[in-house]
Amino acid sequence: MKKITVVGAGGTGHTVAADLRMRGFDVRLCDSEVYRGILDRTAADGGIRITGMMENGFAKIGLITTDTAAALKDSDLVICCTIANRDEEVAEMIAPHLRNDSVVLLSAGSAGSLIYRRVFDRYGLANTLVGETCGNMFSCRLLTERSEVFTGS
């Protein structure tokens, strides 16, 4: 089973993590200490509920953490679902824990792959593949009072 780490505790990160888990992937969800409250609530709820236009259901996420090293251990794919002004911060957060053959995808990219590439090169990760989407993967919103995402078309 492919191991996928989703970085980003907002609506997109929760939606991507839940969607991939419901498709059968081994998913981990992580973010920095700033987002500990959201991650702790999701962990306490046991996972993420999706409602709205996508397949509705509940996704039990294997690991929900602020421990980046644990979240990235043995990952086949890293999907970063954070806002553009966090690109350098997130790249610096994950770089020490990546393999040189890691694959990192940004959603939504906004040319963030250029920033990630620069950071990864400083860490000697020349063979790490970085890609990005041209827009957000999903139209979604995290309902802050519970671990639920509402998805649109």
Spans of model-derived segments:
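A general structural motif
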Residues: 1, 24, 75, 100-101, ...
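NAD(P)+-binding Rossmann beta1-loop-alpha1 motif at the extreme N-terminus of oxidoreductases
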Residues: 1-53
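Alpha-helix N-cap/loop-to-helix initiation residues
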Residues: 13, 35, 71, 87, ...
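Short mixed-charge
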Residues: 46-61, 127
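Rossmann-like NAD(P)-binding element
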Residues: 54-105
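Rossmann-like NAD(P)(H) cofactor-binding subdomain of soluble oxidoreductases
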Residues: 84-147
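Conserved anion/nucleotide-ligand pocket segment
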Residues: 147-153
